[in-house]
Amino acid sequence: MTIKGFRILVSAVAVYLFASASAVAQPMPVDSLIIKGTLDNGMTYYIRHNANPKGYADFYIVHNVGAFQEAPNQDGLAHFLEHMAFNGTKHYPKKGIIDFLQAQGVRFGYNINAYTSKSETVYHMDNVPLKRESFVDSVLMVLHDWSGDISCEQKELDDERGVIREEWRTRTSPQSRIFELQEAVLYEGSTFPKRNVIGSLDVINNFKREEILDFYDKWYRPNLQAIVVVGDFDAKEMESKIKSMFSDIKNPENCVPKETYKLAPFVHERFENMVDTSAKFLALKVFLKQPYPEVSQRAQRSFYKEQFIRQIISAAVSARMDEQVKSPDCPSSRGVMVSNASRTNLYFSLFTILPRGDASPLSLVDFYCDNANRLLRFGLTEDEFQSAKLKVVKNLRLHNALSPESVTDDQIVAGCVDNFLHGGALTYPSPENQDGNHVVLEAAGYPRLYP
């Protein structure tokens, strides 16, 4: 049984299930309550009224840039810049943003936070009380400053180096080192630069202010940014505020295009023995790469059906291995299959198999190959398929609103962010569109989630 053979199997199972669900090449229904627009400077905005919770709103600014945009002498500065956004801006010097918001009951680390990944940087203020109009204007001014007015004063930069060093230390573990070895294999042959977000300790300790400002001025610009505001307010009035407040932000002259990176497919089967002498665990991981739909296809019903089907396959295969590991003679204590999107051009299907006791790595390989061969020859049983489908639907029930009135701000925000960064559909439960994403389940032959 070859890995190539199993890659073909996974694709074949997906095609079989996909074909059995009335294939359609139509866009997903769009939530008509979302106001999406683009300012003259290229900044995108998403606005939606939602009264759950009543009297509150979420405010986000999404930057379609991350560690991948760093030059070699800026390794780690995308993440460092995220920290500096809370250490002084034009209208909120030093810790002004945190002090101002916490005085109004909006807590740092809980309601106020941010994250940096390899491809994006997102700042947000959640569950902000809409006490008065002037306060809302001040919160929008925070987003405005995060767009183009982060100060990066020298003293604040120097003070923050120690904070970043400690974060670097806590992220340096056997697991993280093996993960980096793993990524080197997965990204081999691709155009992605080698970045790990936390960056190089040498850069963190020694970069000059001009270097972080170079990154900031080059990449923090409105044509790579989106404002997302969802909550209990008048949506048209909020749109007017955003147009008034954010239209003055300018792009730099001669904007450098953001490069689109692609993963390279595996050209042959390979085995890598990844060892860290400090690691106290053993695992067999098998990765398969498969084509991921282009951005233009990610708001289609067919795309969401494919995600649903991949979840079913993963759940069925994982459940089968769960039954096998109950035997005391099984060399594995746990076996799991997941299918992840790289958000670029390829899926990763991943099998993780953990040993029982002192079982040898070769016995785990045999366990994987036996399962792969059985799937290739016989596929899934009807009971396995139906049980996995039920599990996936129950999970969707758990993580999706069961009525238009129960959808929360964060659920809507997540869809807007995904639309901006990855081209996902703007589909949510609303009075005008009660089916939303659940049209996928109906098309796949399963009742919709609503009672």
Question: Which residue stretches match the model-derived regions?
Answer:
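An aromatic/glycine/proline-enriched structural segment found at the starts
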Residues: A226-L282, L390-N400
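Mature N-terminal segment immediately following signal peptide/propeptide cleavage
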Residues: P27-Y60
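Bacterial N-terminal signal peptides that target proteins for export
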Residues: M1-S11
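Bacterial N-terminal signal peptides
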Residues: L9-S20
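His/Glu-based metal-binding/catalytic segments typifying zinc-dependent metallopeptidases
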Residues: V256-R320, T352, D409-L426, S430
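Structured mid-domain segments that build the active-site/substrate or prosthetic-cofactor binding neighborhood
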Residues: Q290-E294, S302-D383
